[in-house]
Amino acid sequence: MTATIIIIAVTSIVSFMAFNNSTLLHRFIFYPPAVKRKEYYRFFTYGLLHADLGHLFFNMFALYLFGTAIEGVLVYAFGQAQGTLLYVAMYVLGLLVSILPTYIKEKDSPAYRSLGASGAVSAVVFAYILIYPMNFMGIVFIPIFLPAFLFGIIYVVVSFYLDKNQSGNINHLAHITGGVFGVVFMFLIFSMLKGINIFNYFIQQIQISSWQDLVKFGY
């Protein structure tokens, strides 16, 4: 069983439990005043919770699609044990790093709460974009597909806009921070452990690819 499947299973089990258990929900949710009381575990446990079934499904579906690929890349590059450890480290640290700017911004807000694995999933998705920039990506139920690097650019721009305008209850800042972390993490582990500049690999893939089909329609 892969680490991706284990993460999905654990997250799904805890999320389903919390749907009907308000005590568990309040104990695990990211709540700045509680963190200030040194409940630091909340930097991680909020990622085990989701607002509803749809929220859980989309996060875990994305993690399955992109996490399976990135876990495979890391296992191939670093071996089974080290590759799996690095993958899990990226996911867990993604939870922490993606919520830190939100904590700084909302640390004095007693009404603020956050939950969901989106920040860590964004780290995995952007790691995928870095490795496979010319693979086509799209949004579920919208039959338009773009090269991954273009999708990533649009995603970041839209997220910045929505965060600036405080649109909805989605933590767009965590998505952006998580995505940046995923790219930085991949760059660091490949440069430090393999002596490979993954950014050069990213640019080369874009340069050698055909630009005739930048957009695909349909499934």
Report residues per predicted region.
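A detector for small-residue-rich transmembrane helices and their helix-helix packing motifs
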Residues: 1-219
